[in-house]
Amino acid sequence: MISFSIGQKQISLFPSTLPHRPVIYLHTFGKEGGAVYRALQEIYCPAFTLAAVSGLRWDHDMTPWAIPPISPNDTPCTGGAQEYLGLLVGEILPRVEQNLSSAPSWRGIAGYSLGGLFAVYSLYQTDLFSRAASVSGSLWFPSIKEYIFSHEMKAKPRRLYFSLGNKECKTRNPYLKTVQQNTQEIYEFYRSQGVDALFQLNPGNHFVHAPERIAAGIGWMLEGEH
């Protein structure tokens, strides 16, 4: 593993030993990238490089626009995704790929919760990622469904993965309770556009088996990886 920092972001890089393999950019918490990488080694998947980015200001870096708190004890989202994407594309991505022995065959982007929201949103801002995984993604986020339905992606992705826990929508919170319906509709929209997409329901709530759920999404992205 190679570790380095850019600004306040920490990057844990697990490089492939083979040349010209895919790179997956994962937005995650702390040392969760290592757990995801280990989980992927326990299942069959093609060789790839994992770049796990942590040290995020989740309510800022991962959100496309500002919204007020969605519950009494919550903090507002301040809509800094575009700003952070500039750092990702302009500094983090080049530094990651300077550490590789060869150029990647393609790039994917993945994330959990708000990181899953960001993964989908990024496809509308850059054509650098040809596959994405939104794992327990925050697709309850106000107006994101309407944004997706009314805007064009920078490039049609090869694969899109969505997953949720089957209890995530069972809440009284008026925002969070929409997550499964929104995700289902977004998934069906992409399928209607000819995108190879998968929507998977897992047992449990939002905070269950996150590394394994992320690994499942990345593993599916890597299938038929050419």
Give residue spans per PLM region.
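Short beta-strand immediately N-terminal to the catalytic nucleophile in serine-hydrolase-like folds
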Residues: W106-G111, V135
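A domain-start/cap signature at the N-terminus of enzymes
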Residues: M1-V23, F48, H226
